[in-house]
Amino acid sequence: MQPKVNIMHLPVYQPGKPIEDVKRELGLDEVIKLASNENPIGYSPKARAAMLDEIDHLHIYPDGASVDLTAVLASKLGVESNQIIFGTGSSDIILMICRAYLTAADETIMADETFSQYKHNCEVENTNIIEVPLKDGKHDLNAMLAAVTERTKVLWICNPNNPTGTIIGREELEAFLAKLPKHVLVVLDEAYGEYVTDPNFPNGITLIDRYPNIVVLRTFSKVYGLAANRIGYGVGEASVIRTINQVREPFNTGRLAQVAAKASLQDDEFLARSQASNTAGLNYLHAQFDRLGLQYFKGHGNFIMVDVRTPSMQIFDLLLRKGIIVRAGWKHYPNAIRVSVGTAEQNEKFIQALEEVLIELAVLQ
């Protein structure tokens, strides 16, 4: 049996190392996972109650169109229901966009260090991929614009960018969109957007009326803490969403995911608590990296990329032995690790372990 030639080289996605694997392999009783940008304070109690209420109905297929959830979200966002599509996480929407729009004759543009699933799904469609280097950890919109040709079909912007955590401001984004040819679909991935406190951060959904070639992606995995439920959504002009819907698999969001997401949208107290906890954690980690003399990209999501001045996989392994899981191995940032914001206690334990490791390696005196 012969698979498609263009997928034979593709790596299998590697998530953050599971806690139980680390405990078993290293004989540790406590492990702190700061690798997958999860919500350290959990998820909404209203979502828990909603799932428990639904637990006896798992033998029945979910609403294939997510009608109730769509209505609640549309009201909250100020858009029409036909402008929304749900997926098994926002990564499912990425897959659908590639399936709906890209062929081997097309080109697609993205940053050279960004969320890996853009490139992965474009490669599955055998599309020609143009990777534009980041500039100071940010998307270089001028260079991306210069790379556009008549063959360019989709352009990807992760805002805040994963893994660097940097953002593109409102004026910069709008100036870019005004110059971009209208045949290019812009995927504006705002998976971490709810965490951003910078007043210049653009809400992509408010731009759709003026720029109907935008699709905005968001997720319930991050600030809402529903990572295990796998549910995210896209928002765009109705005809664009209809096109993406044409390639959506049936029943692609589960019953528990739908009711949990709906309840989460109605729990403003939990959302505010998640945001406040994250902001405090970012401020603490920024201050500690300053104290240690480490360079970093200011985090605007729920993670920070920090330069540890030594090969990052070595730091990863040493931190792992101390029961701290982070992410490392970035092609263009070989000396950087990405650490998720944890609870206050977890953040303190991470800094203590990192300082010990850097002193051990003589990176710090």
Located regions from the model:
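Active-site pre-lysine segment of PLP-dependent enzymes
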Residues: L141-E150, P163-V186, E190-S221
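Conserved PLP-binding catalytic core of the aspartate aminotransferase-like
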Residues: T279, Q288-K322
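Phosphate-binding glycine-rich loop
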Residues: H59-E107, E125
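PLP-dependent enzyme catalytic core of the Aspartate aminotransferase-like
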Residues: L318-K322, W330-Q365
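PLP-dependent aminotransferase class I/II
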Residues: A65, N213-D290, L294-F297
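N-terminal "arm"/small-domain region of PLP-dependent enzymes with the aminotransferase-like
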Residues: M1-I60, H139
